[in-house]
Amino acid sequence: MSATTKTKRWISPEEYLEMELHSEVRHEYFAGEIFPMGSETVAMAGASVEHNRIAGNIFSELHAHLRGKRCEAFMNDMKTHIHDQGDDWFYYPDVMVNCNPAGQQKYFCETPSVIVEVLSPATEATDRREKRLAYEMIPALHTYILVAQDRREITIFRRAPERWLREELPDDGEVLRVPELDFSLSLDVIYARTGL
């Protein structure tokens, strides 16, 4: 008995975008391959109530703060596109801010300046490693924020001239600040209605 191997077909970014328009399950794209978001269970079942509340709290405050300004906040159905050395990635951040209208397409953004990911057990490792490294390739990005959903803890990566700086906000009295947007948000508001 011989083992059979499946050959994965390379999918172009254009094919992926067209497939995603008609898919019942959201997928992320990496260099010609597509992957269900987090896992098939997460992609089909969706995120937890806490995840949605946290992302919604952050989005609603950003959206209100940016009203009438050149920057705009988007929620989890808007993809971000990364292109580097001939490879393409498409991810669905939980929240992102774009300040460059030229980088905004109908279904994705190429120039986010802020990206927020709310961590879940199924996605935390990917958000902390793979996505962080990919997002750091976006020239316009200056702030990448990771928000725990099971404890009051926020990790912020900020672009500095030669590297990225990491900052932790583990305390109740802390405030998340994004100076480039003249925006600040307390952990109490971020974690409102979560019981944390």
Each language-model region and where it sits:
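Gly/Pro/Ser/Thr-rich low-complexity, intrinsically disordered segments predominantly at protein N-termini
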Residues: M1-L196
